[in-house]
A protein has these predicted regions:
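Long, contiguous interaction/recruitment modules in multidomain scaffold/adaptor proteins
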Residues: 1-52, 56-60
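Alpha-helical adaptor scaffolds
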Residues: 39, 73-77, 83-133
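Structural signature of tandem alpha-helical TPR/SEL1-like repeats
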Residues: 45-58, 80-87, 115-126, 153-160
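Residue-level recognition of tetratricopeptide repeat
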Residues: 64, 98-100, 137, 171
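Structural register within alpha-helical repeat arrays
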Residues: 70-71, 107-109, 144, 181
Length: 193
């Protein structure tokens, strides 16, 4: 009778070891990833502490592009634009096949926001690359329209924003686009008067 329990116990332990080897390690990493995200942002943490925590999370999910992208979006939502930009740069370097128009546009936006809302050549290049991959990328079109407005190129800004408005499904995005279009129309009208 005891021998049967030993065999059962050994087979159970062996099965658990095989499961962990085949599937458990990834599940364990996912749990740690989610746990780290919950503990990641303490209000009084320094930028360096946050950066180190992000690096450890990225290392934990180095073979999973979805987790890295989720992390970048999480950081963006927390207004941690410099950290989100850094995470997206890691994403584009390590997962080039998964780098689509939205990743490029989000990278451009995080760089713009972390650069005191000033455009530079890198940001403009990311916007153009995003639009080459997807000419209807709403985020890239909004940024392009904003840049065109700053350059006083109001007609092109209105074109960019009207395309963005057409493809946007998000009510908040549409309000932002409408505000930009309204400003561009006022500026264009004042130039024509």
């Amino acid at each position: 009778m005891i021998k049967k329990y030993k065999i059962f116990g050994l087979s159970l332990a062996f099965s658990a070891a095989i499961y962990f080897f085949l599937f458990g390690q990834e599940n364990f990493q996912k749990l740690n990833f989610q746990k780290d995200l919950q503990l990641n942002f303490i209000d009084n943490a320094s930028f360096e502490e946050k950066k180190n925590k992000i690096d450890s999370i990225i290392n934990l999910s180095s073979s999973n592009p979805a987790q890295v992208y989720f992390l970048a979006n999480y950081l963006f939502d927390k207004s941690e634009y410099a950290l989100a930009s850094r995470t997206l740069e890691h994403f584009t370097l390590n997962f080039p096949k998964d780098t689509d128009a939205e990743v490029m546009a989000l990278t451009a936006e995080t760089k713009y926001l972390s650069n005191n809302q000033i455009f530079n050549d890198d940001i403009e290049s990311l916007i153009e690359q995003s639009l080459l991959k997807d000419p209807a990328n709403v985020r890239a079109l909004i940024l392009k329209g904003l840049k065109q407005t700053l350059d006083e190129n109001y007609k092109d800004a209105l074109k960019s924003w009207s395309i963005a408005f057409e493809y946007s499904d998000d009510a908040d995005q549409k309000r932002i686009i409408m505000a930009g279009m309204s400003k561009a129309l006022k500026q264009l009208k004042s130039l024509e008067d």
